[in-house]
Amino acid sequence: MVQPDSSSLAEVLDRVLDKGVVVDVWARISLVGIEILTVEARVVAASVDTFLHYAEEIAKIEQAELTAGAEAAPTPEA
């Protein structure tokens, strides 16, 4: 019988900080059609280096989308 590899808490924490974890929560509580409570949360756990790397990549994607949208929009003729 093969034992699965066990990981220590330090190894798990190192992996989470290296790769990053995002937990996105959206919940609504209502009673008889009346909204009582809405919760929206996004929790990000990552090292600063990992966060900055992915923030740069997201900025590049958003800039490419803006550029593509500007090129596709018709220009008004005078």
Curated annotation (Swiss-Prot):
The keyword Disulfide bond does not apply. GO terms for molecular function: structural molecule activity. Residues 23-31 are annotated as: Beta-strand 1. Keywords: Gas vesicle. GO terms for cellular component: gas vesicle shell; vesicle membrane. Residues 48-67 are annotated as: Alpha helix 2. Residues 9-19 are annotated as: Alpha helix 1. Residues 35-43 are annotated as: Beta-strand 2. Belongs to the gas vesicle GvpA family. Encoded in a 14-gene locus called mc-vac. HAMAP family: Gas_vesicle_A. Infrared spectra studies suggest the major structural elements are 47% alpha-helix and 25% antiparallel beta-strands; it is thought the beta-strands make the hydrophobic interior surface. This is Gas vesicle protein A. It comes from Haloferax mediterranei (strain ATCC 33500 / DSM 1411 / JCM 8866 / NBRC 14739 / NCIMB 2177 / R-4) (Halobacterium mediterranei). The gene is gvpA.
